[in-house]
Amino acid sequence: MARARAVRLKERHKVEISWLPYELHPEISDGGTANSRKFSALTPIAEELEIVMRPSEPFRPTRKAHQAALVVEHASPDEVDTYHQRLYEAVWVEERDIEDPLVLCDLAADLAVPHELIERVVTEDELLPAVRSSMERAHAWGATGTPSWVIDNKLMVPGLQDDEFFDRVIQRLESIRNAEGDAD
C-alpha cells in the first residue's frame, strides 16, 4: 500500500522517493507464525488505493525478501519497482512464501538479474547486515513500523497517511524552505 501511496505522492508533488529495507516483524522466525490478524483498519485504505490485500496464513518473515530486493536494486535499478510490486502481490494476493529462495528467484525470472545471484544472497543471508543497518537508521529517525516517510531529511511521518495529510506536510515544509531561502 505504501507504494501505491508513493505513486500518488510523486504525481501530486514531484518528489523523489527512496525505499529502504525495514522488516515489519523481525521477531517472526523462519517458517512464519500463525496469523490471526485481519488488518481490518487497512481495508478501507486498500479499497481507496484500489489494491488487493488478503492477509496470509502463516505470517512470514521478510528478511530474505528484503535481501532479494536489494540484489535487484543494485543489479537492475530500473526494475526494482517491478520487483517490489511482485513481492507485494506474492504476499497479499497470491499468499506465496517470500522466504523461499526459489519463489524470490521466480519473481525475478524475466528481470535482468542473475537467478544464481538472488539464490546465493538469500540462501547465505549475505545482505542481512544491510537490512539490519537500514532498520537501525529508521529507528534513529523514530520509525517503529512501516511505512515511515522521511521528508526532506527533516521530518519523519509514520503510517499510511492520506493524500491531504501529505499535501499539508509538504506545503508546510516548502513554506519553511522558502522562508529560510528569503533569510539568506
Where are these regions (language model features)?
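C-terminal cap of thioredoxin/glutaredoxin-like
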Residues: M1-V15, W19, H74-D78, T82-D184
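Short, structured active-site "lid" loops
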Residues: A34-I51
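Conserved beta-strand termini and adjacent loop/short-helix elements that scaffold enzyme active sites
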Residues: L20-Y22, S56-P58
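Short glycine/proline- and acidic residue-enriched helix-loop micro-motifs
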Residues: E48-R54, E116-V121
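Conserved N-terminal beta-strand and adjoining loop/helix that marks the start
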Residues: K64-A68
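A glycine-rich, coil/turn loop motif that links secondary-structure elements
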Residues: E57-R60, D97
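Short, charge-patterned binding micro-sites
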Residues: P21-G32
